């Protein structure tokens, strides 16, 4: 039986790192993607030492940049003949003020939605080479709300929590569209709820929310990672899940998902030239 090839973006910290630790105990070949090289190499080393499992690789990439997403996908295609599992978990310290990347995209939109849209697309052949490929989009906030396309990147009005919720909604619509478009791949959308990670103390507003309410209702990264690994290793049907793997109803319309796909294709074309 072949060992699984598992790619985890954001696998160097928080929920992503906890997911990687669990997969290491299964003997899977792990590829961790993260922006900070020192943190990434340290995380890979820690997982190797704690699990006794040597097949843990780290790829440095700033996934807020589409050029880096493409470069990462190319490296993966050259080095691995297939990808059995792709876990999108990259995030980071959410900015209080609207922040724009070097390619002109709002940062939260770029990292938590657009990079996922593009990386999955770039790896379709790698996923298609696996016998039972699975993709998990991990995203907090959001719901099945209507997308305000004129403000999809906070162009008219930006606030941090609005950006987080917007990214959650976009991930929901992305999963809905992918499930229809690529029936040979199983897609999961998992909302972990409030999780005790470094992100919750990344700025004063996050820390305030965490200290007032989060301590009572939050979960650990290990608890959230257990849900994700169960989804991906057991025979759970594709779809939408919350904490403790409670099923969520996909009440979004296919029209909204299609509109987002068209918007994303056009945006990608404008950036790529």
Language model feature labels by segment:
Residues 49-67:
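Rossmann-fold cofactor-recognition segment
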Residues 91-92, 96-98, 106, 128-184, ...:
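Catalytic loop of short-chain dehydrogenase/reductase
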Residues 63-79:
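Conserved Rossmann-fold cofactor-binding substructure of NAD(P)-dependent oxidoreductases
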Residues 51-55, 74-88, 94-100:
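A glycine-rich helix->loop->beta "capping" turn
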Residues 185, 189, 211-270:
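C-terminal helical subdomain
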Residues 120-121:
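A short, exposed helix-loop element centered on a Lys and neighboring polar residues
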Residues 1-31, 37:
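Canonical Rossmann dinucleotide-binding motif of NAD(H)/NADP(H)-dependent dehydrogenases/reductases
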């Amino acid at each position: 039986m072949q060992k699984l090839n598992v790619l985890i973006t954001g696998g160097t910290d928080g929920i992503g790192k906890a997911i990687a630790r669990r997969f290491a105990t299964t003997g899977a070949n792990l590829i961790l993607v993260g922006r900070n090289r020192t943190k990434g190499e340290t995380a890979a080393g820690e997982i190797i030492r704690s699990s006794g499992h040597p097949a843990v690789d780290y790829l440095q990439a700033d996934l807020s940049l589409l050029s880096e997403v493409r470069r990462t996908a190319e490296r993966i295609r050259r080095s691995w003949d297939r990808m059995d599992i792709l876990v999108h978990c990259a995030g980071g310290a959410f900015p209080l003020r609207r922040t724009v990347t070097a390619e002109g995209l709002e940062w939260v939109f770029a990292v938590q939605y657009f990079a996922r849209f593009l990386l999955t697309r770039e790896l379709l052949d790698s996923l298609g080479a696996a016998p039972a490929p699975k993709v998990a989009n991990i995203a907090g906030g959001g719901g099945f709300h209507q997308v305000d396309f004129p403000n999809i990147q906070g162009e008219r009005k930006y606030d941090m929590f609005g950006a987080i919720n917007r990214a959650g909604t976009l991930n929901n619509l992305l999963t809905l569209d992918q499930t229809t478009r690529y029936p040979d791949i199983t897609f999961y959308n998992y909302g972990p709820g409030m999780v005790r990670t470094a992100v919750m103390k990344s700025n004063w507003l996050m820390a305030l929310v965490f200290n007032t309410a989060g301590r009572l209702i939050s979960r650990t990264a290990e608890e959230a990672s257990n849900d994700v690994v169960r989804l991906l290793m057991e025979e759970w049907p594709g779809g939408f899940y919350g904490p403790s793997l409670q099923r969520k109803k996909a009440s979004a319309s296919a029209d909204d998902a299609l509109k987002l796909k068209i918007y994303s294709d056009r945006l990608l074309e404008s950036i790529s030239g």
